[in-house]
Amino acid sequence: MVPGEENQLVPKEDVFWRCRQNIFDEMKKKFLQIENAAEEPRVLCIIQDTTNSKTVSERITLNLPASTPVRKLFEDVANKVGYINGTFDLTRENGVTTADMAPLDHTSDKSLLDANFEPGKKNFLHLTDKDGEPPQMLLEDSNNVDDSVHDRFIGPLPREGSVASTNDYVSQNYSYSSILNKSETGYVGLVNQAMTCYLNSLLQTLFMTPEFRNALYKWEFEDSEEDPVTSIPYQLQRLFVLLQTSKKRAIETTDVTRSFGWDSSEAWQQHDVQELCRVMFDALEQKWKQTEQADLINELYQGKLKDYVRCLECGYEGWRIDTYLDIPLVIRPYGSSQAFASVEEALHAFIQPEILDGPNQYFCERCKKKCDARKGLRFLHFPYLLTLQLKRFDFDYTTMHRIKLNDRMSFPEELDMSTFIDIEDEKSPQTESCTDSGAENEGSCHSDQMSNDFSTDDAVDEGICLESSSGSEKISKPGLEKNSLMYELFSVMVHSGSAAGGHYYACIKSFSDDQWYSFNDQHVSRITQEDIKKTHGGSSGSRGYYSSAFASSTNAYMLIYRLKDPTRNAKFLEVDEYPEHIKNLVQKERELEEQEKRQREIERNTCKIKLFCLHPVKQVMMENKLEVHKDKTLKEAVEMAYKMMDLEDVIPLDCCRLVKYDEFHDYLERSYEGEEDTPMGLLLGGVKSTYMFDLLLETRKPDQIFQSYKPGEVMVKVHVVDLKAETVAAPVTVRAYLNQTVTEFKQLISKATHLPADSMRIVLERCYNDLRLLSMPSKTLKAEGFFRSNKVFVESSETVDHQAAFTDSHLWKLLDRHANTIRLFVLLPEQSPGSYSKRTAYQKAGGDSGNVDDDCERVKGPAGNLKSVDAILEESTEKLKSLSLQQQQQDGDNGDSSKSTETSDFENIESPLNERGSSTSVDNRELEQHIQTSDPENFQSEERSDSDVNNDRSTSSVDSDILSSSHSSDTLCNADSAQIPLANGLDSHSITSSRRTKANEGKKETWDTAEEDSGTDSEYDESGKSRGDMQYMYFKADPYTADEGSGEGHKWLMVHVDKRITLAAFKQHLEPFVGVLSSHFKVFRVYTSNQEFETVRLNETLSSFSDDNKITIRLGRALKKGEYRVKVCQLLVNEQEPCKFLLDAVFAKGMTVRQSKEELIPQLREQCGLDLSIDRFRLRKKTWKNPGTVFLDYHIYEEDINISSNWEVFLEVLDGVEKMKSMSQLAILTRRWRPAEMKLDPFQELVLESNSVDELREKLSEISGIPLEDIEFAKGRGTFPCDISVLDIHQDLDWNPKVSTLNVWPLYICDDGAVIFYRDRTEEVMELTDEQRNELMKKESSRLQKTGHRVTYSPRKEKALKIYLDGAPNKDVAQD
């Protein structure tokens, strides 16, 4: 034997033991290597491909031994992603940016450990372009990897990305390149828009038909005659040219469908390929009129058959000639459990005659009597392209389901049709036979119809918006030889799925190479005869007859054969044989494709990143998207951003620069000094679809210089606090390092703010309302909780406040107020003449509450006779405070007055608007009535619906420069001048002084379960005293002029308020500005969509409000406990709009229906102009638009009638005395249908004593005069008034249900308000001409659209497939 190398084991004679020892030694060495490899640290590499936007979201993960050479890393990555090694770069990510990192050397033998990779940690790398050139694909030209997956797959392919995910993204790379690269088969696929697979399979079949494609190429489009967008033949020409010349794997069909007049929604409609075939051929015939291709469809696809009836007694035969475009073949005969085995068997069954006997006898014109006869079909002429439809869809009348028949039906590759043609009939048709009028032009036996498919009625029925007429058909030559009827199969359209839906694709034989291909949307692959046999149908194992209702299977649905005739069989036109206009079209499409390719390349190398800029003048943050080529330098990118933000006339270009920015944290990460000539692709770390950071176009003043931002720095916004003025200044930005101490940080702030560092206090706001005093000088900022972006408050006043505990200090209280203050814009009620009387009533309602505390410092208003808003507010709140103290003294036993929570009685508060010394008062009831009736317009303009609490809980604090208590509008003045003035005027015991106190206050935001029964919180307790929160927090109001203007008489307030205040207290503060008590106005919150919702829960805080929210104040009495605001609408049963809003009323628990009607009468008279007596109208339940239970006068709310917030009720005016006396009665709305006149009578109400159908029939007979036995009725469908087209009502409703009572299926009439249609069964339906029908359809459509009802009621009605010849859907309802 030949001696081996050192690592080979070569056995020698008589050395068995030595050989065995060598084997053991070798195995031991291998085990040691494995053991060492297991112990060796490993490096986890995570690679992101940034070379294009499609793969940027993918990650490649490699876990390699630390000793692996760098070159091996490149090889592994290249194998993973399918790139050629050496055509891409790998760049390390250092945690901040990849811009400063040099690419790794793909030839280096240095180990990963020596290349500074960290074992045991994640090492992130970016795969980038090499020298500006994109990586080269290993299989870019052939795409063998792609096609290997689908090469033999002819069924529906899985959606891209649905394959189980691995860390390699080869499949993902395929999904991108598959659109750009042509299949190895040489054929181009079609993109499925959504559910257009049926369209794709037909288009590919037509494209692979030489006769059709060549004829289409010969047709020339005339620009002057038609718009190319709406020309179906021209768009098919373009599509075929692209299918023949494009280098893409798949092309779009949107231009073709647009020429059909389809919008994007049509792509989501499932249709039948056979239906599309006929509709498309009809449309092409119309477009090709008066051209060489006018008769193309008939020449290629149209055949003839004879429909005959032969008398068996005298032999007389009546017949007519029908044309067809396809032959529908039954899979399984009706009533049989056995399917036809083959297409030939089904064809024989198709022409098998049937005997007409018994009751189906035929009336013979010659015998002049009914005789037995034979009825059948005979083929007279077969088309050049024979289309066979296999009728796999059927309806199962047992289960009432549509089913698919998956039975096996074989079909041959070559089909001899000579046995099915009746040559004798074609040679010499019987002279005595009778031809029906119009038989020559009556159409085809297409689909399920054997005639009249091209008739006008059919065109409307199938939705083809054209008047079709078949041209004269050439009669087949007599003496046709049988051997010339051999057909060759070349297209099989396959349906995969069930009767509920599925997928179409086509298996097509190419006449160029005689190979079969699967055209499955964008995927084209080569298949074999074995794959074709799989489409014959059938399944392994036994399957019941009805199991196919929901079964999914793949089988042939449509077959297309071509006649084997060497004299007629055409070949595809070669390029040099193209007509001149097709050559021009090819060149034009190539140029467009090249342009698209260049554009894709540009997109592939374009960095798209968010760009922000703080406008130097407006001080508004602007946002845009910067799209810059990766090779553009930073300097060029700055110029692009400068122009994009429209700063040319605002600031010089040299005062702008781009910096790395984190918009979420408002953090400037780094600046790019000295990198003005660096490409943006390198700065941004490659081309990506999304970036983890943004860019900021930073600006400066001409006399300033840019600050350098380095990675690792943190940004701090410093707010200077002035304790004396109680102000918080706008922020100053300071950059620091996390390893700096608090002492060093103070020195840094001192330089920026010029405050002394020795007495400086720094408070860090780590999150909302979380304040932390930095009291440890030696602690680092990182230890104190600093992050990328931070917010601190500093102050350096040398006061005794330094000695107090932080949570008890003045600084903490000021910052706490600052954090919880929001700005609201309040729209006050219109200052109309009616408002003056309301204010007067408010003034009279108050009593003298005593003099204002003389120790309070009064705020002086502006010069003039009128007091300022601030002065009014100051005076009002002083009176409220004084009254509160008086109340506390009266109660006496409530404990410490500083902790008192007793609320004041607002009925005794004197308004600051009152005249001094006025003591006149009015009764509360009179006051309420006066407010409600003095200005009805205010009530008409009120919001139509109230609402429960709005649950959004945003917690936004006001900007630091907004708040300043140095203004003159603080709510309460200081009771003790020696105390440090606080924001709300109370001493330090009255404000929250710890987080625990705030937490307890937060409980006020929960629902008040004690008031749930009334649907809202009452402003008054059972004793009538106010429940408003007396802990007055910060409130400041200033006059405000809205930009958009609110109209004359309206007034705005800009209110700064502590959002922990309750709604009750907030309303109390607004009393002086509204001019009425808080119980007589309502607060509506205005949302961004200008919708208004009433805020009603008085014990809740304003924490759900945020900065700059708008509030509208409307006059109207607030609800008390047990009261509900009810929306009253008028029911007008015979009006076009049966529901009309009248007014908002207040109903109370325990009130009877009659009492509520008594209260409604004066309101209806004054506000709606309705003068009604109490017995001439009723109230009834309203459920959306439907009238319901009739409420009787003695019914009691909350006992007999459940009532809730946002309740609605119908008010119905009666023509006579109320007939409803008892709940056992049933009120039904009836309407007579008159078919002879095609109209509906007005509604009439019937009151039944029981739910008996017999009683209903009797009552209907009484009011209509129709005999009892001729009454037919049906329940209306949908919402009131149950409108339905008069064209559909006679057939669509379920007339005369077989029931004896109304409360059972299918009626289920158990409550008042049901709609019943009735008719006289002896009355015939009016016969309409087409013109009358179309006119009536238009009128009905217009009527029903106005009432919001559909023209027809048809559940799950399939939408007809249409092709619009004018390029857009016809709005004429008649075409629907």
Curated annotation (Swiss-Prot):
Cited CDD domains: peptidase_C19C
Enumerate the spans annotated as USP domain. Answer: 188-564
Question: What Enzyme Commission number(s) appear in the record?
Answer: 3.4.19.12
The residue ranges flagged as biased composition, category Acidic residues, are 1008-1021
Report the residues modified as Phosphoserine: S832, S911, S934, S1014, S1018
Keyword Phosphoprotein among UniProt keywords: yes
Region feature Disordered, mapped onto this chain: 426-452, 835-863, 880-971, 985-1025
Predominant cellular place of this UniProt entry's protein: cytoplasm
What GO CC terms are in its UniProt record? cytoplasm; nucleus; SCF ubiquitin ligase complex
Q: Which UniProt keywords apply?
A: Acetylation, Cytoplasm, DNA damage, DNA repair, Hydrolase, Phosphoprotein, Protease, Thiol protease, Ubl conjugation pathway
Where are stretches of biased composition, namely Low complexity? 882-900, 954-970
N6-acetyllysine: modified positions: K122
Q: Which PROSITE patterns match?
A: USP_1 (PS00972), USP_2 (PS00973), USP_3 (PS50235)
User: For bias kind Polar residues, which ranges apply?
Assistant: 430-452, 930-939
Assembly and interactions? Interacts with BTRC and FBXW11. Interacts with POLB.
For this chain, the family text in UniProt reads: Belongs to the peptidase C19 family. USP47 subfamily.
What is the protein named?
A: Ubiquitin carboxyl-terminal hydrolase 47
What lineage, starting at the top, does this entry show?
Eukaryota, Metazoa, Chordata, Craniata, Vertebrata
